[in-house]
């Protein structure tokens, strides 16, 4: 049980400190990709929503 708690704490701390990457800038050559990079963290949520839509389409069998 303690190991699971430690793992959760490590993940939570890394998520907090990884927010510093949000202020990082892309190199000038890739500046045109900024809008795509801003949306990329949300993409996994689209797959989660797709799963619910798919299950609704098949009547939650």
From Swiss-Prot:
Its main location: plastid. One of its GO terms (biological process) is photosynthesis. The chain crosses the membrane at residues 40-60. Keywords: Chloroplast, Membrane, Photosynthesis, Photosystem II, Plastid, Reaction center, Thylakoid, Transmembrane, Transmembrane helix. It is found in: Plastid, Chloroplast thylakoid membrane. The keyword Thylakoid applies. Pfam families: PsbK. One of the components of the core complex of photosystem II (PSII). PSII is a light-driven water:plastoquinone oxidoreductase that uses light energy to abstract electrons from H(2)O, generating O(2) and a proton gradient subsequently used for ATP formation. It consists of a core antenna complex that captures photons, and an electron transfer chain that converts photonic excitation into a charge separation. This is Photosystem II reaction center protein K. It comes from Sinapis alba. The lineage of its organism: Eukaryota, Viridiplantae, Streptophyta, Embryophyta, Tracheophyta.
């Amino acid at each position: 049980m303690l190991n699971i708690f430690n793992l959760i704490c490590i993940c939570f701390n890394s998520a907090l400190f990884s927010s510093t990457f949000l202020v990082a800038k892309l190199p000038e050559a890739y500046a045109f990709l900024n809008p795509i990079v801003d949306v990329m963290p949300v993409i996994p949520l689209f797959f989660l929503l797709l799963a619910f839509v798919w299950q609704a389409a098949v009547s939650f069998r």
